[in-house]
Amino acid sequence: MRPETQSAVTQLDSTLTTIEKVMNPEDLESRVRELEQQASDPTLWDDPDTAQKVTTELSSVQAKLKKLSTLRQRIDDLPVMYELADEEGEDALALADEELAELTADVEALEVKTMLSGEYDSREAVINIRSGAGGVDAADWAEMLMRMYIRWAEKNDHKVDIYDISYAEEAGIKSATFVVHGEYMYGQLSVEQGAHRLVRISPFDNQGRRQTSFAEIEVLPVVEQTDHIDIPDSEVRVDVYRSSGPGGQSVNTTDSAVRLTHIPTGIVVTCQNEKSQIQNKASAMRVLQAKLLERKRQEERAELDALGAGGNASWGNQMRSYVLHPYQMVKDLRTNYEVNDPQKVLDGDIDGLLEAGIRWRMAEQQGQN
C-alpha cells in the first residue's frame, strides 16, 4: 500500500473511532432493546401518536447501528482490498481508490451528523422562501431556490410537502412554504437561513443587462407536542379563499385555501395545496406553531445576548452568492466554501455547502463558549 494511501486509511479509521465514541454503539443497542420491548406491548397502539414515535425511533436507532457496523466493516476490508489490488494490477487499484474516496465521503457525512446535537436538530424542517429586491428576477430566483431544495431532498430520499405557493404575476413566486420530512432535516437545513444573492444576465431584460436579485430563506423546526406551543382559538383569525395558481388563475372551485392570522403577533400563514379546507387549516397551524416556537427562541436568545452570553440571531443574513455572470461561482460568505459549477448546486447538489455550514456553525458556537 502506498504511504499516502496508508495515511488516509489510518486517518479514516481514527475518525470513525471518534464517531463511535460519540454515538456509543453499546448505548444504541441498549436503546434498541428498550424500544423493541415497548413495541411488543399489545396496548401500544391504543395511543397511535406514542406508537408512531416508538416505531420511528426504533427504525432510526437501528439504522444508526447498521451504518456504524457497515462503515467499520468497509474500513477493515480496505487493507485487504489494496493488498489484492497490488497483485492484480491498475484496474483493481483504481477500484480500491474509488472505494477509499467513497468511504471517506460517507465517514465525513456521518461525522457532520454527530455535530447536530442542538435541541431541535433532529426535527423535520419547515422552509419559507420569500423573493426580495430584484423584481421579476427575484421572483424567478425564489422559485429556483425552491427547486434546488426540493431536488436535494428528492436525491436524499426525503419526502417534501408543499403547503403554499404565492405565484408572481409575470414569472416565479412571491413566496413558498414547504416541509422537508426526515430525521435531522432542521439541523442540516437551518444553515441555509438568510439572504441568498443571484447575479446573472436577466432573461427578462430585453437589453441583456446583468441583474442582482435576492431571496430570503427561513428554516424552522417542526413543532412537536412536547414543545407546548398552544394557540387558543381566540388568538387566531381564520380566512378562507379559493386557491390560485400562476398568473392568479383560480385552481379550485371551492374556498379550500386557508389564511391564519395570529392576532397577538400579527404573524400570517397561508396554505392552499392540500385537498380540503380542513387539511389546509391543519397544515397552516403547524407552520404557525413553528413560527411561534422560533419567535420564542429568538426572544430567549435576545435575553442571553443582553447578558453577554449569547450569539447573533441574524447570523445567516447575506450568507451566499450565486454568480452566473461574468464568471461562474457559488460562494458561501460565512465559510468561504466555493463551488465552480453553479448549475450542479441549483440542481440540488448542496451537500458540500451544508457540511461547510454545519462545521462553521459549530466553530462559531465553540468560540462563544
UniProtKB/Swiss-Prot annotation:
Pfam families: PCRF (PF03462), RF-1 (PF00472)
Post-translational modification: Methylated by PrmC. Methylation increases the termination efficiency of RF2.
Keyword ATP-binding included in the entry's annotation: no
InterPro entries with a match to the protein in the record: PCRF, Pep_chain_release_fac_I, Pep_chain_release_fac_I_sf, PrfB
Entry GO terms, CC: cytoplasm
Subcellular location field: Cytoplasm
Positions where N5-methylglutamine occurs in the chain: 249
Keywords of the record: Cytoplasm, Methylation, Protein biosynthesis
Predominant cellular place of this UniProt entry's protein: cytoplasm
Entry's Gene Ontology molecular function annotations: translation release factor activity, codon specific
Family stated for the protein in its record: Belongs to the prokaryotic/mitochondrial release factor family.
Protein purpose: Peptide chain release factor 2 directs the termination of translation in response to the peptide chain termination codons UGA and UAA.
UniProt protein name: Peptide chain release factor 2
Protein species of origin: Corynebacterium diphtheriae (strain ATCC 700971 / NCTC 13129 / Biotype gravis)
Gene that this polypeptide is encoded by: prfB
